[in-house]
Amino acid sequence: MKLLSRLLGRRRPNAGGQAAAMRPYFYLGEEIALTRLKCGHFIYVDPLEESVCSHLIAHGEWEASTRRVVLGLVNAGDHVLEVGGHVGYYTLGLAQKVGSKGSVTTFEANPRLAALSRRSIRMNGYNDRVEIRQQAVTDVAGDIRFSVSRQFAGGGHLYVWDGALGADTEVIEVEGIRIDDLDLPDVKLIRIDAEGSEPLILRGAEKMLQRHDIILCIEWDLVQMSSRVQMDTFISWLADRDFLFWKITGSSELAPLTVADLATLPPCDLVVARKQPVLGLGQTR
């Protein structure tokens, strides 16, 4: 435990000859390591995972502009639903932002990632407000096949074909659930990063989406989503529910989009709501 009780304080010269602080990183074995995020949270990571964990280890952050918007969408006491929590990077920030009177319910189908996330939540003292559920969210309840990879764990998804994530792809069976079948408090924000399953997840949340003030933050990837649904039908489905759309920019701003824009939009993160959200960016870190 002595290793975990201190941070690395040594400095080394970088390529330009200037001193650069070493990233705090604690290797705990082949399966697990611990690092500290720029925001101050400690987070458990898989040292062999390259899609997200490598960035957290090297830089202490990931998708900084999107994270800033996500945290800016919630306030103390809010309730958040997260689908695709990975190792808990967004989860930790959301837990801090909603405070002890709020809650975060996070779904992560990959058992390895869910276990790491639970450890991080416990270490940072958020067990009172966060629940990590190792289940897949979709539009039909029941056991489903789910593709996982240790090297590229950020790409885990509802099964499409064998080997989709490379040589170490493994297909596991997990419990699938619908959001509308859950007994949850009044959710303000749904954050979804599900590698193309976003349309299925939202169709299983139709009752929750009837809340006038609901806000969605979703990954938008036409290629991935079109493997699940007809995109013109899905876009019309969203528009028919009076949703408006904004793209999250690299400077953490919300750029308005038309419904027509969605059909040709390159991969990005969207905020979806029925009125322009107010971002509390000054309160995030």
Language model: regions and residue ranges:
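Core alpha/beta nucleotide-donor-binding catalytic domains of modification enzymes
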Residues: P111-A114, R118-A153
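Conserved acidic-Pro-Pro-aromatic motif
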Residues: I32, R178-R285
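S-adenosyl-L-methionine
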Residues: M1-R129, D168, F245-R285
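Short internal loop-to-helix segment that lines adenine-nucleotide cofactor pockets
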Residues: H59-L81, R129-E131, D143-R145, Y159-H212, ...
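Short, charged/polar, Gly/Pro-enriched secondary-structure boundary elements
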Residues: F152-G156, V278-L281
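Short, glycine/acidic-enriched loop or turn micro-motifs at the edges of active sites
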Residues: E49, G85-V87, P111, V137-D139, ...
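Short, basic/glycine-rich phosphate-binding loops at helix/coil junctions
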Residues: V45-V52, A153-D162
